[in-house]
Amino acid sequence: MSVKVDGMINKKSKTHSKKLDARALAEKIKKNALKQQAQEEPAKEENVAENFDTVVDPTAELKFKSFNELKLIPELLEAIQQMKFTKPTPIQSEAIPHALEGKDIIGLAQTGSGKTAAFAIPILQALWEAQAAYYGLVLAPTRELAYQIKETFDALGSSMGLRSVCIVGGMDMMDQARDLMRKPHILVATPGRIMDHLEHTKGFSLKNLKYLVMDEADRLLDMDFGPALDKILKIIPTQRTTYLFSATMTNKIAKLQRASLHNPVRVAVSNKYQTADNLVQSMMLVSDGYKNTYLIHLLNEFLGKSIIIFTRTCAHSQRTALLARILGFSAVPLHGQLTQAQRLGSLNKFKAGKANILIATDVAARGLDIPSVDIVINYDIPTDSKAYIHRVGRTARAGKSGKSISLITQYDLEMYLRIESVLGKKLPKDPSPSKAVLDTLHVHVDRASAEAIRQTKDFHEKRNPKKNRDDRDREER
């Protein structure tokens, strides 16, 4: 027997003779969530207050309003104009003048803030005079972000004869060694793979390195790159300029700052828990057994829109992408169990509009330049509030409007309430489709789900991953 409760379809429990008091349960969950949040947040806020001397209001007057004011070389200004950088972002306005003076920088800035150009422009300006090999090393937590950073350097250095290389896991070591022997100016790398080359590639050394950048340092540490970072810091020269950028400030980041930077200028230009004003956020209560059905219903509702669907695991990403394809949607997966070529293929198809649905783990939540995303759907709600902020931040960018929808089951209520607490507001509930619509759609979805599960099993059986340091630059699942 089924009953419909507030948009959710559930089977009556046979093991409980009394009805649960839903309101009391919700209040208990909320109380526990708020208590836990209160215990966690003061420490985080204290870290930010302690480690950041300069907190900049993003709406404050910019230190410079045009890149022409910076006395950059003509070749760099030409590239900036070609990239249509009309005015600096707040992080660029704060960081670039100090960086051009040769100071170390530590910046608290979110994805999409323009921080890549904030460190690339000063490095390229200095490189013009030096023209030295292995001049700058940029460390990134993920392969996709590393490739994206390289693209920015290449675009800004297009008139300078810049040589850059991307050194990440999942690619052939010998090919990369040959690239390194061509004496590139800029290296963009994941820590595990660049450490492999420092240890095993004959003739490769960073003894003359002048610039070190650690981008998204919080993720570098979250993904267990700490030991590799320690080794790299011991190998490279102490007389260098260092930039450290992070979305959040923690004790680990503060420790890394003390170990790697010298009298840095500290700048924060973002609110950790801020979402864009032009982002419409909502949730939809769903039955766990009907989750795929609700998702396909939403894809039908937003047919033709550019959509990112976030899942918690690689398996969910792969299976959900297959499900969507079987039902006629143009969807591609993006997760850490794909090869590097497959991941770049999925990303490029989505960015080019050849596929309008990207189904990803949190690898796509930060750092990647994915323009014009209309809708973000949290198929699996994230396990922490920061991840939620980063996910929904993939839409409503550059002044455009956007929408995010989170599918919430009865098992997600505690985490959902914690997210609402951090946001400081309740998310409106979207209406559910009628039971008749769901039941009709569920028949087709159920059949397609069985086929998607079979194909996912085949995908995993064909995989034969190498278990070495190459895989330490895997993505968050």
UniProtKB/Swiss-Prot annotation:
Write out the GO biological process terms. maturation of SSU-rRNA from tricistronic rRNA transcript (SSU-rRNA, 5.8S rRNA, LSU-rRNA)
Per its database record, what is this protein's job? ATP-dependent rRNA helicase required for pre-ribosomal RNA processing. Involved in the maturation of the 35S-pre-rRNA and to its cleavage to mature 18S rRNA.
Domain Helicase ATP-binding: from-to ranges: 96-267
Q: Name one GO molecular function term.
A: ATP hydrolysis activity
Which residues are listed for ATP binding in this entry? 109-116
Enzyme Commission (EC) number:
3.6.4.13
Where does this one sit in the cell? Nucleus
Output the superkingdom of the source species. Eukaryota
Specify where it is mainly localized: nucleus
Any Pfam family: Helicase_C
Q: Which residues form the Helicase C-terminal domain?
A: 294-438
Top-level EC class as recorded in UniProt: hydrolase
State the reactions this protein catalyses.
ATP + H2O = ADP + phosphate + H(+)
Q: How does it assemble?
A: Interacts with the SSU processome.
Question: Which key words are in the record?
Answer: ATP-binding, Helicase, Hydrolase, Nucleotide-binding, Nucleus, Ribosome biogenesis, RNA-binding, rRNA processing
Q: What is known of its domains?
A: The Q motif is unique to and characteristic of the DEAD box family of RNA helicases and controls ATP binding and hydrolysis.
Q: Which family does it belong to?
A: Belongs to the DEAD box helicase family. DDX47/RRP3 subfamily.
Sequence segments annotated as region (Disordered): 1-22, 452-477
User: What InterPro entries does the database record attribute to this sequence?
Assistant: DDX47/Rrp3_DEADc (IPR044765), DEAD/DEAH_box_helicase_dom (IPR011545), DEAD_box_RNA_helicase (IPR050079), Helicase_ATP-bd (IPR014001), Helicase_C-like (IPR001650), P-loop_NTPase (IPR027417), RNA-helicase_DEAD-box_CS (IPR000629), RNA_helicase_DEAD_Q_motif (IPR014014)
Protein name (Swiss-Prot/TrEMBL): ATP-dependent rRNA helicase RRP3
List the source organism: Debaryomyces hansenii (strain ATCC 36239 / CBS 767 / BCRC 21394 / JCM 1990 / NBRC 0083 / IGC 2968) (Yeast)
